[in-house]
Structures are given as C-alpha cells and as structure tokens.
Amino acid sequence: MSEKTSIERLRERHRSARHGIGLRRPHFDALLEGAPGIDFFEVIAENTMTIGGRTRAVVDALAERFPIVVHGVNLSLAGPDPFAGEYLDALEGLIERIDPPWFSDHLTYSRAFGVEYHDLIPFPFSRAGLDRVTERVLYVKERFGRPFLVENSSYYAAFPAAELSEARFLCELVERTGCGLLLDVNNVYVNAVNHGYDPYEFIDTLPARAVVQIHMAGHDDSGTFLVDTHGARAIEPRSEERRVGKECAT
C-alpha cells in the first residue's frame, strides 16, 4: 500500500477534526473549563517538548480529551547540517507522550554550518534542494513512524538558482516521499502579493489529496510588501479552503 494512500486514509480518519486552534498559555484556564466548537489543538514543539510545570500538565490533560497535533519550527528540513540529535530526541519524547495524529514543520531551514538562526530561512527551489529535502523528509518519516506534513512558507526574495516554482517543488516532494501538506493560506497570499503570482493557481497546482491541515493567520502591510507576522486578523479564508476540499483540518 502506497504512502500516498496512507495520507488519504489519514484525512478520512480525522475528517471530523475540522476546526482547531493553537494552544497558548493565556487560554489555559478557559480551555480546561470547556472548549465548545474546537475539534483539536496544535502545540508548537519547541514551546512544549522540554517544558514542565503547568504547561506540561495542561497539555497532558487536554491530550486525554482532544487530538493534539505537533507543529515544529526548528527541524531545519532544508538545512545543510545533519539533524540535531538532541532536538530529535526531545521531539520524539513529546510525540510519544501526547500521541499526535500527525506532526509538521516548515519547508525552510534554521540551522547551517553550525549556526542556529532561530528563524525560518527560505532556500532556492532547485533540483539539488529537492533531493536534499526528500532525503530528510524520508528520514523523519522513518524515524518517527507517523504521518508528517510539510508547510509552505513565506519568503521575501526570489532566488536566481531556483529551478522550480514552490508549488511544483511541493508537488514533487509529495510524490517522492508520501508526506502530507500543511497549507498556510496566509503564506500563499503574502507570497502571491510580494512576488506577483496568482494565489488560486498556486493552490490549484497542489495535490488536494495531500492537504491534511490548513493554517490561517494574519500579516502586516509595510506599504511596499506584506510580512507574515501572525500579528493581525486573518483575511477571508473561505474561498481558499473550499478549493482544497472540506476534509482538511483548519
């Protein structure tokens, strides 16, 4: 049975998990009392995997009542350095503890030549880059043994070395690895405005069967370009959501 089919089965299995929110400390008390209309939660791996105290207690308590998915920012999927062993061990501990139906990270890097950037750094969508990311995604899937999603990211400069569009890069990555996609519609919009492409064409290019989760967030307008800050209200997402079907978690 192909890995592509496993992502389709994942969508079917969790089709009732329609609407989720990011789990944040200011909401702990209210969520412990009740979470009407919320089907699942998302935790940031780096804010959760080595933290004890109340944060750990609340995450563990909610994990008994709701699915909790894990979203990372520091896996450095596209990086030239080997994966950080301590990071992988800590991530593995979190995943084993809360048993997420899937986990995810960005199509970026955050570590290179021994330097930690603590940011999501874009890279050229080249054939060599595709080979490197393919190898690393396959390693992550094998090590953790559960569905893994890759998120499209925002970027603010075009790379002359790029040989593929971002959408085509993601399509080929899905075909090569059987990974799922976490579609960030705000990142699509920000990139489309900044780089002058059609966001609907981008979304239509992606394999809808691979889109398991959708992120919706806001951005800031500098006057000359948009910046993905998650610091403003999300723009209307519903038309984009309909384009990739109704079986995705948002």
Predicted regions and their residues:
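Distinct, well-ordered alpha-helical segments
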Residues: 28-33, 159-175, 191-204
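A short alpha/beta connector and helix-capping loop motif
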Residues: 59-65, 192-219
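Active-site acidic/histidine proton-transfer and metal-coordination neighborhood
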Residues: 84-181
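Conserved small/polar residues in nucleotide/adenosyl-binding loops
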Residues: 241-248
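Active-site beta-loop-alpha junctions enriched in small/polar residues
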Residues: 24-26, 44-46, 73-76, 107-108, ...
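Flexible glycine/acidic-rich beta-alpha junction loops that bind and position SAM and/or redox cofactors
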Residues: 109-115, 158, 190-193, 215-230
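N-terminal pre-domain/capping segments
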Residues: 1-93
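Conserved, mostly hydrophobic/aromatic
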Residues: 41, 103, 148, 184, ...
